[in-house]
């Protein structure tokens, strides 16, 4: 037992030396966690877009249609920049970026409302920036609800024996849960922070592994800086090295970045710490499993580009997981960041407890076990292959 612990300690210390002596690996574990969160947060720093300019094409020209336009202008989401003579004029203004949306009120708008029939209006939005589209749709939905309530109130008050004081429509109030600012950054950055940590250390592990292979090619299949121990001690020592290296970046990502940019932190800090333990272990063993497939240092950057977009999609940030088919859900389940993103959203943004996120928490521990077994098997296989000097004709 003492011998195994000594071997683990030797591998652990040696892996530190390999990481700190590799400029590429240091860039990945320092620059990526330090710079990327700030870059992404600054992109979404404004959080909420207000007063999006729109033009109104009013072919009805009645008090009700004018009231509808005034109600739109009164919302915080949009402002009526001007009235257009017709749709052609409105499209020209959108093309010239004088406005980012068009609201079209047909000539029968007020008549249909007065008859109690379904009234029709049309909206055209610029989709180049999703925040503008969201604001325009939100403003129109809000005004439609308010105007519909006023119409219903007017009908009730015209009854033969109306209730005293009139009848008010059902009041509604929008109460944001978790994401109080309703900002895009507060919605997606907490999940992206977890993905950044994973990518940084996957690339660090791959970079160190590729450097080791290059040393073997230069020395007839022998890595002169490798500690000769068993596969178990090698695996545990390497994993402990990368897990301990993750601690400071994780504190920075999950504590200081949200403070700097006022992202929501409604969860218990101890629940976040408990969540980080299986996540760091899963990322370490996941990286030690994948390191075999990166054989050259030059291949690390393509891996960064390809896997970052792929893992981002599978995590549910850009597309909800329930809308994916079974195959992609299964693939996403194999990625540690997928479960961590879901859990950190619930804990930090919504104030959930770790017990309420037990599915993601248990899934991370399952991945720890799975990737430990797989990485151990891969390491044993690779060690067996290296018993004979590796000769690369290339």
Regions found by a protein language model. Give the residues of each.
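Residues that define the loop-to-transmembrane-helix transition and helix capping
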Residues: 23-24, 232, 298
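Membrane-spanning alpha-helical segments of multipass transporters and channels
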Residues: 39, 61, 92, 244, ...
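Alpha-helical membrane-protein architecture signal
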Residues: 5, 9-13, 186, 227-240, ...
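Extracytoplasmic/periplasmic domains immediately adjacent to an N-terminal transmembrane anchor
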Residues: 1-186, 381-394
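Hydrophobic core positions of alpha-helical segments in small-molecule transporters
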Residues: 28-29, 190, 236-237, 300-303
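Hydrophobic alpha-helical transmembrane segments of multi-pass membrane transport proteins
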Residues: 35-38, 175-258
């Amino acid at each position: 037992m003492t011998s195994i612990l000594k071997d683990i300690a030797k591998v652990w210390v040696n892996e530190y030396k390999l990481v700190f002596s590799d400029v590429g690996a240091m860039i990945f574990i320092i620059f990526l966690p330090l710079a990327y969160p700030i870059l992404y947060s600054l992109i979404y720093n404004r959080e909420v877009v207000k007063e999006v300019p729109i033009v109104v094409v009013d072919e009805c020209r009645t008090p009700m249609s004018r009231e509808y336009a005034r109600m739109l202008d009164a919302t915080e989401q949009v402002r009526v920049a001007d009235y257009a003579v017709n749709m052609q004029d409105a499209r020209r203004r959108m093309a010239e970026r004088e406005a980012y949306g068009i609201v079209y009120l047909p000539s029968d708008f007020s008549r249909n409302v007065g008859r109690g029939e379904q009234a029709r209006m049309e909206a055209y939005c610029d989709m180049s920036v999703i925040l503008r589209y969201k604001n325009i749709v939100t403003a129109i939905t809000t005004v439609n609800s308010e105007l519909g309530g006023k119409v219903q109130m007017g009908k009730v008050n015209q009854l033969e024996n109306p209730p005293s004081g009139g009848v008010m429509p059902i009041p509604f109030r929008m109460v944001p849960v978790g994401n109080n600012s309703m900002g895009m950054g507060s919605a997606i950055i907490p999940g992206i922070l977890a993905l950044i940590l994973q990518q940084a250390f996957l690339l660090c592990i791959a970079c160190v592994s590729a450097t080791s292979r290059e040393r073997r090619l230069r020395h007839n299949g022998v890595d002169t800086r490798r500690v000769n121990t068993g596969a178990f001690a090698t695996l545990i020592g390497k994993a402990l090295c990368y897990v301990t290296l993750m601690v400071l970046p994780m504190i920075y990502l999950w504590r200081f970045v949200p403070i700097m940019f006022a992202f929501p932190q409604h969860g218990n800090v101890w629940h976040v710490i408990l969540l980080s333990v299986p996540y760091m272990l899963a990322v370490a063993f996941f990286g030690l499993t994948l390191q075999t497939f990166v054989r050259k240092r030059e291949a690390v950057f393509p891996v960064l580009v390809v896997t970052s977009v792929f893992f981002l999609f599978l995590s549910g940030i850009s597309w909800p997981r329930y809308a994916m088919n079974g195959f992609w859900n299964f693939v996403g389940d194999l990625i540690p960041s997928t479960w961590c993103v879901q859990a950190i959203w619930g804990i930090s943004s919504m104030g959930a407890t770790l017990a309420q996120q037990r599915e993601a928490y248990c899934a991370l521990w399952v991945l720890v076990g799975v990737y430990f077994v797989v990485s151990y098997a891969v390491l044993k296989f690779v060690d067996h292959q290296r018993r004979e000097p590796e000769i690369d004709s290339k």
